[in-house]
């Protein structure tokens, strides 16, 4: 039985759960065959959130959570295989991003940590695993992020149209795809993470569905200006940012305490929009088509606000290009696993700032 398929697993900084996809790369164009979503239990979500900040006993907690994550990832793989009718021997590899708890590429000895006990995941699934995709790029002087632009280029580059692909997960980032074939990409700022945290705290809902709650508030312009004064927003690319920078803990340092929660939610949405729009207007020149993917793609109020900020440009979802916006990032890590197994570099130095193209990831054989 030929192992023709790849599985991609992504659990992003929003900490909502696990996206798993089954992909076929044998066709002329990559094909997303099936998908499966497994939400995180609330207790696991809170434990992972706590690991974003230094605390006593964090090494032990990180190791045990890595084991828990491997079991949840294996459960997601099992659900995906049952849904698709594919057997484990038909899968060449699992590309598992892991759960980011620290990302510090600018440190003297830069590092990044994505939790997952990969050997345990191999044992539980019987499938070869590729993980730790970011460390090699950082070792080569890069930011280790974003890594998805190489896949965006393979899927969406068009010699006749200047496109930008915007991923709005916990953090927002973009890939610039000019007509001349050069590619850049970088983090823009916050995505859904702070909005989700604020929404959960004040409404009890995990996220603000379609941005309806934010739409009831008004933007607090003074607060927005203070948040946008963070030096990160003025940094030129390549740049990347970690989840712990954009948190409600950071936000609370700017609040007076008498703000309407709905107004703060509206302001956080505009902060995400402003971060993205500034990057596109400042660094993506004459781009005419903007396509959004990630969880934020389903926030219709956010998309409408982004369209307003980028008037004169087409703003849509990657769905219209043939790839479901919800699954694109997991799809990318299936592709990155294949790149490594085939001995093909997975980074783009002009995106991450690395010294050159590098093979990304570590292979754990079955």
UniProtKB/Swiss-Prot annotation:
- Respond yes or no to whether keyword RNA-binding is given for this record: no
Which residues are noted in the entry as ATP-binding?
A: 12-19
Q: What is its EC number?
A: 2.7.1.170
What domain of life?
Bacteria
A GO BP term here is: amino sugar metabolic process
Spell out the reaction equation it catalyses.
Answer: 1,6-anhydro-N-acetyl-beta-muramate + ATP + H2O = N-acetyl-D-muramate 6-phosphate + ADP + H(+)
Q: Report what the protein is called.
A: Anhydro-N-acetylmuramic acid kinase
> What organism is the protein native to?
Nitrosospira multiformis (strain ATCC 25196 / NCIMB 11849 / C 71)
